[in-house]
Design a protein with these regions (language model features):
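FMN-binding flavodoxin-like domain, especially the glycine-rich phosphate-binding loop
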Residues: 3, 17, 25, 29, ...
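Short, hydrophobic/glycine-enriched beta-strand segments
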Residues: 4-9
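Glycine-rich NAD(P) Rossmann-fold beta1-alpha1 loop
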Residues: 12-13
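Short acidic active-site motifs
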Residues: 39-44
Length: 154
């Protein structure tokens, strides 16, 4: 079994791009196994002690439908002892009132499931009004704004 499960949606082009970049940077197929959200089940989340999960933020701060369909199932799991790092995409210019909320929504679910969130990053350098992804002055994951700060994704 691989040591890290990387969960994201294949049909979300920007999220897929960032997920593949993360996978390459962390050691590729020897270390990370991809689990596509469109095909994921509860036991997929139970299979890994370390997970990286990714999602974009849609519309008014919502998770994409492929995550929404899994949320009821995810809310019933207990993930105590498992570590979860979250990454997500947002657009701080077009959606400053709910920038990268998808990360925060996922974080809430994994926190309820008693997982340990890792990978907090600085919110410095971003311009926005509100975000559910903020914990104090930090993001509860890696925030990527490919539309306005694409150079930071490299």
């Amino acid at each position: 079994m691989k040591t890290i499960g990387l969960f994201y949606a294949m049909n979300a082009a920007k999220t897929s791009h960032i997920a593949e970049k993360i996978r390459e940077d962390l050691g590729g197929v020897k270390v990370i196994e991809v689990v596509l959200i469109e095909k994921a089940w509860q036991n997929d989340f139970q299979a890994y002690d370390n997970m990286i999960v990714g999602a974009s933020t849609w519309f008014d701060g919502e998770l994409p439908t492929y995550w929404d369909e899994l949320l009821p199932e995810l809310r019933t799991m207990k993930l105590k002892g498992k570590k979860v790092a979250i990454f997500g995409l947002g657009d701080q210019i077009r959606y400053p009132e709910n920038f990268a909320d998808g990360i925060g929504l996922l974080a809430e679910v994994f926190e309820e499931d008693e997982a340990t969130l890792v990978g907090f990053t600085s919110s410095e350098g971003y311009t926005f009004e509100r975000s559910k992804a903020l914990r104090g002055e930090q993001w509860c994951g890696l925030v990527v704004d490919l539309d306005n700060q694409s150079e930071q994704a490299e």
